[in-house]
Amino acid sequence: MKIILIVDDQPDFAELLANLLRGEDNEIDTAYSVREAKQKMDLKKYGYAIIDWSMPDGIGLDIIEDIAGDPGAKFMVLTGSPNRIIEDTVYLYGGEYLQKTDCDLLNELKLFLGDP
């Protein structure tokens, strides 16, 4: 079973992702802020995190730094504000980077999760 945390300050987008990925092999939690994500991460170990970069109470890096300390965890940053510095930072921490406007979003997410 894959335990996934989706973090996005746009609840509709977070729920859309959760519904796309929900299935018998996925347990999905959502958080709508950096603070809420950190609280959930204190209570549960996530194998995967899909994180928005820009949120009212912080940036994706605030969450990535916690996840990067777990060698078994993977993360992907989804952003609607493409930026080369953000992309480089994500790769530096060993994550994946994807723009929300990518027309092949579902296939990219499946590749990230290791699903065929």
Residue ranges with predicted function:
Residues 78-80:
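Hydrophobic/aromatic residues positioned on beta-strands within the core alpha/beta folds
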Residues 52:
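Active-site residues of response regulator receiver
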Residues 8:
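Conserved acidic carboxylate
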Residues 30-48:
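Acidic, metal-coordinating helix/loop segments flanking the phosphotransfer/catalytic sites
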Residues 61-72:
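Short amphipathic alpha-helix used as the core "switch/output" element in two-component signaling
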Residues 11-29:
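Two-component/phosphorelay signaling modules centered on CheY-like receiver
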